[in-house]
Amino acid sequence: MRDVQAVHAFVEKHRRRRQSNKVLHGHPSPVHWLERDIAMDEVLRTRARANRQIRKRVNLYVGTPYCLPTQPDRCGFCLFPSEIYTSHRQLDEYLGYLEREGDMFRDHFAGAELASIYFGGGTSNLYKPDQYPRLMEIVRGVFDIPPHIEVTLEGIPQTFSHDKLLAMKQSGMTRISMGVQQLDDELIKASGRKQSADQVFRTLESCETIGLPASVDLIFGWPNQTLAQMVRDLEAVAATGVTHITHYELNVAGRTDFSRNRRGELPSTEDNLEMYRVGKAVLEACGYTQVTPYDFEKQEAELPSSYLYEELFRKPFQSDENGPIGFDAWGWGYAGISFFFGTPQSPGWAFMNQVRIDQYFRCLSERRYPVMRGFQYTPADLRLHLLFQELQGMDVDRKAYQRRFGLDVVEEHTAVWEAFTDLGWVTISDDRVTVLGDGLFYLPLIQNALGYDRLEQMRHSRAETTMTVPAAAPRPARVAEEPAVWRWRRSSA
């Protein structure tokens, strides 16, 4: 949008609608990841060529497909792929296929240096204690694991135990991310989960005893949630001394139970904005510092954790004393999402693995890469993706953007920045573009405005392509827009 008034009109049209954040997928949404015939060997060779131009390290995500069954399905709100867990035989079988996928990629990652490891889901704490060493050994079958690397595992309260947490630490895992969502025992029932506040506190107590840093996810904007309930839960979790709290708005979309049957019980966007404001104030009063629109951490924690996976995901191109350095992300396993960025001048690919477990298994049984579809970045798309991600850190370094792309990020999007400056959501200096105030709550709206022109081009191109496809041709499977916080770790519904 080149006109400031057009941006203001866009904001007024959309500011009362529910938001869907872009923490994981950035730009563009997987709705536009339409390439199905991806020559993965060439993609991997292209990554190797990029590695010769910019030193590349790997953020590794290892997924687990399974979640406990709930009524309503998928905790009532989760938009992300998962399979229903029924027995440990599923996990044993899955680990065998995970190992097969690693075998296919091993030569391509020969000599690659890991930057961080994240075990996500599904629900990655469904495994038995003796399976966590095997998980780490599967990773070691492909990569050398550096000493002192950050290794995170996410899970849900009711499937943690002291023995399991101890096994996680002994196998090399250094951080736990717990998807609590609601502490209130009555509110959590809306999701069908069989968890209790006591399980949350016992898990955090075990983490402290063992010496394992932990983070907690809480959601606001829940059906029938009051401001007083939200404050009580935040204060109770903060009182445990947990080092990191992610507090994010419930995403409601698609065919989920919350979207179809509970919309009348949900707070309005204006109510959610007030919850965001109050939640931020409560957490800051409890000694937490805001580091993203959704994340709050204690800077002087007794059990420090760098949250490196998240930081590198926001800033995949950096520099150190040896020059430029890049951070690709490999999503290993069922429904894994990968970003092989290439270079700013020669962008690479984003792609996702199969989202049906039978298809994932079939591909690997046939010695085929289990990739479902993907997207090849243009230079303009890569700029938008990196801009979206850097904005998650609440500001953009203008000089670094200029060095990387040869463009000034303010001049590139003048009308958008001017409109959001008018609203008090953005400030601009010679060095930085900073998002502040209510702009942090409305960051998805800011990102939508920044990407509007390019997305319109893509929609028109897609429509023209669709017109040339016979009516009987299968349509691409829909992949949900990003829920209200990143889903490399928030996928444990």
Task: Give the label of every model feature segment.
Residues 84-106, 115-118, 122-407:
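C-terminal scaffold of the Radical SAM
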Residues 54-96:
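Canonical Radical SAM [4Fe-4S] cluster-binding loop centered on the CxxxCxxC motif
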Residues 336-493:
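Charged, E/D/K/R/S-rich low-complexity terminal regions of large eukaryotic assembly subunits
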Residues 72, 76, 188-189, 402, ...:
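A short local structural element in Rossmann-fold oxidoreductases
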Residues 1-61, 69, 461, 468-470, ...:
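Flexible, acidic/Gly-rich N-terminal and inter-domain linker regions that tether
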Residues 64, 155, 435-436:
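Hydrophobic residues in beta-strands and at strand termini
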